[in-house]
Swiss-Prot record:
This is Ribosomal RNA large subunit methyltransferase K/L. GO terms for cellular component: cytoplasm. It catalyses: guanosine(2445) in 23S rRNA + S-adenosyl-L-methionine = N(2)-methylguanosine(2445) in 23S rRNA + S-adenosyl-L-homocysteine + H(+); guanosine(2069) in 23S rRNA + S-adenosyl-L-methionine = N(2)-methylguanosine(2069) in 23S rRNA + S-adenosyl-L-homocysteine + H(+). Belongs to the methyltransferase superfamily. RlmKL family. It is found in: Cytoplasm. The gene is rlmL.
Amino acid sequence: MLNFFAAAPKGFEYSLAQELTEFGATEVKESVAGVYFTASLTLAYRITLWTRLASRIVLVIYKGSCESAEQLYNAAYCVDWPAHFSNKSTFSIDFHGTGGFLNNTQFGALKIKDAIVDRFRDDDIERPNVSRVDAEFKVDAHFRNGVITIAMNFSGPSLHQRGYRSTTGEAPLKENLAANMLVRSGWQASPSTLLDPFCGSGTVLIEAALMAADIAPGLQRSRFGFEHWRRHDKAVWQEIVEEAKARASLGVKRCEIKFYGSDIDSRLVALAKRNAENAGVLELIEFNVADALTIAPPAESGYLITNPPYGERLGNVSELLQLYYQLGDKFKKEFGGWKVAMLCSDIELVSSLKLKADKQMKMFNGALECAFNIYTLHANSTRRDTPVLPDGVDIADIAPAFANRIKKNAKLLEKWAKKEGIDSYRIYDADIPEYNVAVDKYLDYVIIQEYMAPATIPEAVTKRRLSDVLLALPSAIGINPNKMIMKTRERQKGTSQYQKLDERKLELITTEYGAKFKLNLTGYLDTGLFLDHRLTRRLVGQKSKGRRVLNLFSYTGSASVHAALGGAKSVTTVDMSNTYIAWAKDNFALNGLQGKQYEFVQSDCMQWIRDCNEQYDLIFIDPPTFSNSKRMEDSFDVQRDHVNLLSSLVKLLSPTGELVFSNNKRKFKMDIETLTKMNINVTNIDDVTLPMDYKRNPHIHNTWLITHA
């Protein structure tokens, strides 16, 4: 009897152990990401050809304690390598694990390589050559907890590569993962009608058809690891292969199970057909191009087993939440009597089905941890009587308090915005504490920003509430889900609010009191326009006529644009970021503003203030709450440093000049006493700079008008 280890993805151990036991293996023992077992050579061949779950099978040649590099070398040297492979065959070492004396896998592989080469030489045999790519004989070594296991790769290339796949879709499902879905769902034990409405390249259906037609999954593989093993019995292997071919031929003819696959992408359906044809099961599967939400059950009962789109796969989160919710609704209404088994990595999407799972398991799709949930659908079951709206769900069903509030807000603010002459504004700002998000409307798009939840609220609760928000929004405010953009906002430190989120740009032009501004809805956490400063920008414009205007920490220069449109004699725009200076220039161009009177400066604002000798009639400054950018000489804290900052700025202010100072620190306290002693007048103007759409959040910013005493 020979000792083996069958490797598989994490989460497969139980299913794989059962499969090996059914094959007739003995001493079956589950381990991490695999199963140890004992088998005869004949049975090992059969397992290699027929396993649907294992990724790799290795023949254990040596296993023992190892506490030094010398012991590692000796362990490998004691193996009779010339009895295992010819010196004419190339070989390679695949080494895994570190610890103790061994902190480098490359060193471990080198020690074993040296031992193998020395063993050949000491037996007066010319040494074999190492090949890092496509070696003919592969040694697999694992070091863990002071134990070294040296094995031969018995199966060869990964066993999930059946040989029928021509190319893959955007998000391919590994064949052995599809097989495990079929096993754990219960379908393999009692096969019946099978439907996959997101079939992609057809993997789930093809694996199921191979099972039902008694076709060995390894029958089309062209290479196996044991082919260059000296103890390989070609006659026995060939006999097992011929037997499998005969069973396959008979199995296809006898198979009476019906398989149905569909996908909305016609290219993937064509690919699925090619793969099924390559696997020899095309005649068993009916493929169609169809939307999963429109298909009808092909039988009164059966299994719906699928791997639908999710975050790491395809689609944006808002659309996916809508899709999952409507899928759950369809399953409940139309698939009574069916079992549904679904693989998904996103708990929010799974919860949006609004179905109660009979079983919940973990599986890994590559390195990605996924939930595999099984649902039993009962006949004549409905979730509700009210219909699903075309672009979303019934608002009475999901987060009614949130839905009703934002619907009311949107209706009120839409009329106000038209009257104001703006098309970008906030329609919800954590009005209801349980739904801790801000929702901003930019033309016909909305951005949803999730605030960091208190640590006392369980993550599962916050995720469920967020998914309910995203589900309720489309019908509540009449927006297409594909025009919803989700962002997560936390407390910003330093320049984190300006870090890029997405290389892809979704750019729009928004209008504000006659000014035009370029927006980037996806590139950064912020869009290029701070909506809460809308009235402050207008105030700057109203105060600018005939004046020399300075805008510091200018961001994208929107206040500078208002100043220029307001008739400023000159406008100087200063920001540390080249990106935002370029953006400010774009905004000026959008408004037809050009000329030498408009100056753009890329510089550390604090240093620029210290170096400046000019005088200005109007200064606007909206500094960050805190910054420690590498480009700045010192860190900046608006609470700590505002007195020094304002006293320096007043020196640049003409005798009749005005300084508009704003910041977003919620608990900011202006040191009026110290500034008054410095002959500086300070007046809070929050009441005239807080827009209507931010009245629900009066602490969003604070604004001050500062002059010489």
